[in-house]
């Protein structure tokens, strides 16, 4: 504890509040893409719009999905790779391939990679709880921008098939265009009343795009043959894996820290990402630590707390300040403390090399997604175990710290 106090005291030259803190993204920084009475899809603002320190996150976007019981996200595909993590609730995810279909029953803590272009649909199979799902998207076409394509058209977005000419569609499906239009595409002309009522009903449920209500029987049909994540293995090449499938890497009476790294999972290795889940009990502290290579995007799923991050002055400035920053590079850099209150739905980013500490004012759960995960090391600056300062040799401690080496080791 002495080391932690000495370390923080030596860097608290100045501090920034939540509003000036570029590392915290409050829940109101999510933009709503789709919303109706059945649920919503929200997209967090671009990381690099907050600060130039996040330039390496330009091609990463964070989405949140939430839906009511017995609802379905209609089939679609996106030009981005995804890492999907279930924050709460139960759901059935179906992923389609040219000659295959895989369905998975997901629950809290499950994660899975969805390759770019995968056609998927997602059903809430929980009778009471509203599942929350987090997606880290990595676009493959244009950095930082992703585009979704629906198999079935809606009132606000046409099916991707509707973009083709009549001749191409007739040749592809080996039938006349009127039949294709009736079965697969939205009707454009007047129809008999019995068909119009079916269309009107379809447009009504699709009025706000992609989230629709389904029956209990339909949910059971979707989930009955679905596979579940393995609780004993994290090495699945394509199926879901659970963040708590192995023992925590850190654990004591104050909390638990679970983590799955690329070395343990092929899906994560493909994208060079790690995923972790951290439980911190009320009144407890995650000791000051930093990552050597990884940039970690953290979402608060439950509870409240405070986080402190040590950075350098002007890291809250955007790209328009680059010239001014270049002029200041040769001046002394002021070390600065950034503070923020944490609440459910908040997101914060921990750049590589930036020490951070988190205090829980109620039982706190965090989900982290680490970019540049390969060969990353987490270094603690305080504590009895894994404390990197304890590895400093005695003569160096005498020179580096104001206290004696004995006092530093205490």
Curated annotation (Swiss-Prot):
Signal peptide feature range? 1-15
Where is this chain glycosylated?
359
Q: Enumerate the GO terms in the molecular function aspect.
A: nutrient reservoir activity
Regions of biased composition (Low complexity) lie at 225-238
GO CC, any one term: vacuole
Q: According to UniProt, where does the site described as Cleavage lie?
A: 221-222
- Which residues belong to any copy of the Cupin type-1 domain? 23-181, 241-409
Q: Which Pfam families match?
A: Cupin_1 (PF00190)
Per the entry, what this protein does is: Seed storage protein.
Give the family from UniProt: Belongs to the 7S seed storage protein family.
Q: What is this protein called?
A: Provicilin
């Amino acid at each position: 504890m002495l080391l932690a106090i000495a370390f923080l005291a030596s860097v608290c030259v100045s501090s920034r509040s939540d509003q000036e803190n570029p590392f915290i993204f409050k829940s109101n920084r999510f933009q709503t893409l789709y919303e109706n009475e059945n649920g919503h899809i929200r997209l967090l603002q671009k990381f690099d719009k907050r600060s130039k320190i996040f330039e390496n996150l330009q091609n990463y976007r964070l989405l949140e999905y939430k839906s009511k019981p017995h609802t379905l996200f209609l089939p679609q595909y996106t030009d981005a790779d995804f890492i999907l993590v279930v924050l709460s609730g139960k759901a059935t995810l179906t992923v389609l391939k040219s000659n295959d279909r895989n369905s998975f029953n997901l629950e809290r803590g499950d994660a899975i990679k969805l390759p770019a272009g995968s056609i998927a649909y997602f059903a809430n199979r929980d009778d009471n709880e509203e599942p929350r799902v987090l997606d880290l998207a990595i676009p493959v076409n244009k950095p930082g921008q992703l585009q979704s394509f629906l198999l079935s058209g809606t009132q606000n977005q046409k099916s991707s098939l509707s973009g083709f000419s009549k001749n191409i569609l007739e040749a592809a499906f080996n039938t006349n265009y009127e039949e294709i239009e009736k079965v697969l595409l939205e009707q454009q002309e007047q129809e008999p009343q019995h068909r119009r009522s079916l269309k009107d009903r379809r447009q009504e449920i699709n009025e706000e795009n992609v989230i629709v209500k389904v029956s209990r029987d339909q949910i059971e049909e979707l989930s009955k043959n679905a596979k579940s994540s393995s609780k004993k293995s994290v090495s699945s090449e394509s199926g879901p894996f659970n963040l708590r499938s192995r023992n925590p890497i850190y654990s004591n009476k104050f909390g638990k820290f679970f983590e799955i790294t690329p070395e343990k999972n092929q899906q994560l290795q493909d994208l060079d990402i790690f995923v972790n889940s951290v439980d911190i009990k009320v009144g407890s502290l995650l000791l000051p630590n930093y990552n050597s290579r990884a940039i970690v995007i953290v979402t608060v799923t439950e509870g409240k707390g405070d986080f402190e991050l040590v950075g350098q002055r002007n890291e809250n400035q955007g790209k328009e300040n680059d010239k001014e920053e270049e002029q200041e590079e040769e001046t002394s850099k002021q070390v600065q403390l950034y503070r923020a209150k944490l609440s459910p739905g908040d997101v914060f980013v921990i750049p590589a090399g930036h020490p951070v500490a988190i205090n829980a004012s109620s039982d706190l759960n965090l989900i982290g997604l680490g970019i540049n995960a390969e060969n990353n090391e987490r270094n603690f600056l305080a504590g009895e175990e894994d404390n990197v300062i304890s590895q400093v040799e005695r003569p160096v401690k005498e020179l580096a710290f104001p206290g004696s080496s004995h006092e530093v080791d205490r």
